[in-house]
Amino acid sequence: LERDKKQKTYTPKEALIKAAAYCAYQDRTQQEVRGKLYSYGLEPDDVEELIVRLSQEKLIDEERYAQSYVRGKYGLKKWGRRKIMQGLKSKGISDYCIKQGLKEIDPDLYEQNLLHLLEKKNATEKEKNPFARRQKLTYYLMSKGYESDLIQDALKGLEEG
């Protein structure tokens, strides 16, 4: 199916209203909003002006975005710090905002989550060879974004009993 529809272009004023609704629905990054504004057919100067305005009105707040991203990915998906940082960087979030977002993670709960994931995966892992099993568990936890030193400590604890 060919798409001959021409993307409607908006005036900066119309785009501001649409972008405000887009940001009000859920937290957005500057990068996401910038892409949306360009899709409205705006000129680069107008896009940057609207980004500044939306930021001043707190409709775009990257620190708040980072905090809610961390709460979601850590709280629901049990991602580790490394995977969360990588996800935020890919969305163009500054190092400062990433650092602020990571403060949402309770260090004690973080290790409990790691141990819980390890025990759950260990219970379902079919590999009998201890070396291969350890390697599979390590890969799994690293894919979840946990730090290798914490993984090694957790594995030692599991093996000791």
Predicted segments, located by residue:
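An alpha-helical, amphipathic repeat domain used for nucleic-acid recognition
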Residues: L1-G161
